[in-house]
Amino acid sequence: MSLCTLAINLSAIKNNYFLLQDICKTSLVGAVVKADGYGLGAVQISKALIEENCRHFFVASSEEGVNVRKALGIDVNILVLNGVFEHDALELIEYNLIPILNNLKQIEIWQQFGNLKNLLLPCYLHFNTGINRLGLSSNEIEQLINNRDLLKGLNLQYIISHLAISEEIDNPYNLEQLNKFKAYLRYFPSIKASLANSGGIFLGQDYHFDLVRPGAALYGLNPLMQNPVTLKAPIIHLQNLTLDSHIGYNMTFTTKRDSVIATLPLGYADGYSRNFSNQGKVFINGRSVPIVGRVSMDLINIDVTDLPPSDIFLGQEVEIIGNHCTPDKIASIIGTIGYEVLTSLGNRYRRKYTR
């Protein structure tokens, strides 16, 4: 078992959910739990949020959806963002998963399996309004508008779209997407709608519609939200090095003074990026400590020379992620985003869920 502890505060995630509910008073608030709840545990997070009456959970694939369904039971909606494919349609039906249909081919597949089972199968439609990843194209949407038989035999519950740059509040592309979405919805007046992701929630009520879909904000990846994640590692080795000593693979760091170097039991195999080599920071009792040398597969070295001797001992806990170094803060060091930091954490850590 790993010597490092990844602690996930479910109460903090719940508090973030409450705040989002307060912002979106006229809308339902779902939860995006894809990628194993952004690396933090989809099942544990979903169970916590269902206690607060969350009833819409978004996953990427049927496999993720089955995992959540088995944990939660039948009294929730589980939405599959990648839609349906011929190889997993029966699994979606068996586990009552709702696909978000992204093109005419997926609509056709879902209709065919509905006819096969003599069922009116539930679905959402995804209209592409400008992110240009998934979603029905403007040409496909026009076909649906002009030929409603293309949706015959389906229980269409929601129409959704996805914002491309919602974290930039003043970017005009947000309004462009909103207006395009509203224009499409005029042709489907009886169908509920969903547009806002985490960033979209903070763009204002015009973006909320009937259901919002926060992911990042639930997990503290927003300045207004509470960070629920703490990753700590113990010092497992200490050494005193003289001036001009080399540290780690390829000798990328050379001491400029007599130094005290501590070794921690985590590395890139644990999702701690090699890009933190010689530029990452960790914290001991609130004081910043630099990473020196290469991040290796299972180990990193830190320079603790400037700490008081009372803080330097075998077993001392070192904060890798926490309130001093949130996922967003450490992501900025290596030019990535907090999402990547969380989803890269892997399964080697000892996990602890608190409330």
Curated annotation (Swiss-Prot):
Keyword Coiled coil recorded: no
Pathway: Amino-acid biosynthesis; D-alanine biosynthesis; D-alanine from L-alanine: step 1/1
Domain of life assignment: Bacteria
A GO biological-process term: D-alanine biosynthetic process
GO CC terms: cytosol
Molecular function GO terms recorded: alanine racemase activity; pyridoxal phosphate binding
Catalytic activity: L-alanine = D-alanine
One Pfam family named in its UniProt record: Ala_racemase_C
EC nos: 5.1.1.1
Cofactor: pyridoxal 5'-phosphate
PTM-bearing positions, type N6-(pyridoxal phosphate)lysine: K34
Main EC class the enzyme belongs to: isomerase
UniProt xrefs under CDD domains: PLPDE_III_AR (cd00430)
Residue sites binding substrate per the record: R133, M297
Active-site residues per Swiss-Prot or TrEMBL entry: K34 (proton acceptor), Y249 (proton acceptor)
Keyword vocabulary terms for this entry: Isomerase, Pyridoxal phosphate
Family recorded in the similarity comment: Belongs to the alanine racemase family.
Protein role: Catalyzes the interconversion of L-alanine and D-alanine. May also act on other amino acids.
The protein's name in its UniProt record: Alanine racemase
